[in-house]
């Protein structure tokens, strides 16, 4: 979306080799891949130097020792927003999650809510986008469970009645592009699809699509 509108894009990734496919979405030299980690506060100013807008997409569904909810959703978000403010970046867009709240019983959504607060403390005019479960060709959620189903005779379904409104990745990208293009600030956008599904229903749809029972 942004590349098609002529923007030059700098993407910070831990392993640029795994993100080489992103370059095909722009012209030669339009999309730059930089090896880095948003959790490393001291390096952030160099990553965003000269940028007109910073978009924070860093997130995880599943915690690991090196990628905890606190480190990624709260600390990294705070550090990036702080670096953007100090670097006089004009616009900051933070990707959160639908249902994010510091009071949530879900550790994921709680960390997302606290991450929003951390961003706004450092960059008060930040835009907050709260998408529901995002699906697309390389999404984390569905691809992870698809891989699990291929190696396991069963899939554990915890919280099977939890409801989602899956939203297509292109629709989220269009919303982000619109904020950048119109230079909007202090906007809160909740994004969800037209249909509501339980977690169990989503898993059953997934199994049907990959021809598993």
Q: Where in the sequence are the language-model features?
A:
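Mid/C-terminal beta-alpha module of Rossmann-like enzyme folds, strongest
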Residues: 1, 179-213
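N-terminal Rossmann NAD(P)H-binding glycine-rich loop of SDR-like oxidoreductase domains
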Residues: 1-12
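Conserved Rossmann-fold NAD(P)-dependent oxidoreductase catalytic core, especially the SDR/UDP-sugar
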Residues: 8, 60-61, 66-136
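Residues in the short beta-alpha loop(s) of Rossmann-like NAD(P)-binding domains
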Residues: 15-16, 195
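Residue-level signal for the nucleotide or nucleotide-sugar donor/cofactor binding architecture
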Residues: 39, 72, 164-167, 197
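A conserved pocket-lining segment of Rossmann-fold NAD(P)-dependent short-chain dehydrogenase/reductase
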Residues: 147-167, 171-192
